[in-house]
Amino acid sequence: MYKRQLVRKANTTDNRILSLIEYNNEDVKQENSNKNPAVNSVQRDYMAGEVSRDLTTRMLLPHDIVEADREGIIHFHDSDYYAQHMHNCDLVNLEDMLQNGTVISGTMIEKPHSFSTACNIATQIIAQVASNQYGGQSISLTHLAPFVDVSREKIRKEVISEQELVGMEYPEDVLNEIVERRLKKEITKGVQTIEYQVITLMTTNGQAPFLTVFMYLNEAKNEREKKDLAMIIEETLRQRYQGVKNEAGVWVTPAFPKLIYVLEEDNIEEGSEYYYLTEPVSYTHLRAH
């Protein structure tokens, strides 16, 4: 008698939620290769998704749409997020947030004073965006390029200060070479921050951010910025070609971020100024596939 009462009280989502908690829901196991249904955060996302799906089919959608979906005439996407006022994808305006500051979790984030810090802030923005939507997002490396020169000037001041400390002065060409070498190390560090943060961050929906990185030289506002952007792109391609080590210590190509590289007159033809960037793009693409 008591069991019969429980059955009558059972919610329409009970069986599916219990099956995913016990890890015996085959639909969930096959649903999304980017989510591991054995992980607690993923299970919580799926539990919320079942509630949303139930509300969507019982209360929010017209009956004919629900029936057409069940019969396979159409497919209604993302019913597991439909109940919330949540959007899908974003083109992230990194430029505005980096240049003018932003707020993350109630904390004021001011304009960064180095390229590596700008990259770190960018990954925090990416994580926040990914945790408050259910689709992908895109950023442009052009928005990070101005901070290369910020770091250049900062490094120059540091080198000059070191000269004064030891009582010597480098010739201008030597000074410039030291600055550029240190700058390249900073660019490597910043790009690596984005690469590793993106693939290791776990957002509130239990997965790494679906990030696309846009690489377009002619978005740069001037020639100095364009050359700095080229350095960022070159390092991004180098690290993507190298890959990351998996749990077995084997180098693999990460699924994210996706890279989009734009071809124009100054990089498409052999012998053009930035063709040296275009060649490794093809190698990176072949290795990824």
What are these regions (language model features)?
Residues 3-183, 199-203, 209-215:
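Often metal-dependent polyanion-binding catalytic scaffolds in large enzymes
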Residues 164, 186-207, 229-249:
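Structured alpha-helical segments in the cores of large, soluble enzyme domains
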Residues 177-184, 188, 222, 226:
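Hydrophobic alpha-helical scaffolding
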Residues 218-287:
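Extended, regular secondary-structure scaffolds
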Residues 123-126, 194, 277-282:
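Short, Φ-rich (hydrophobic/aromatic) sequence segments
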Residues 1-5, 284-289:
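Conserved small/polar residues in nucleotide/adenosyl-binding loops
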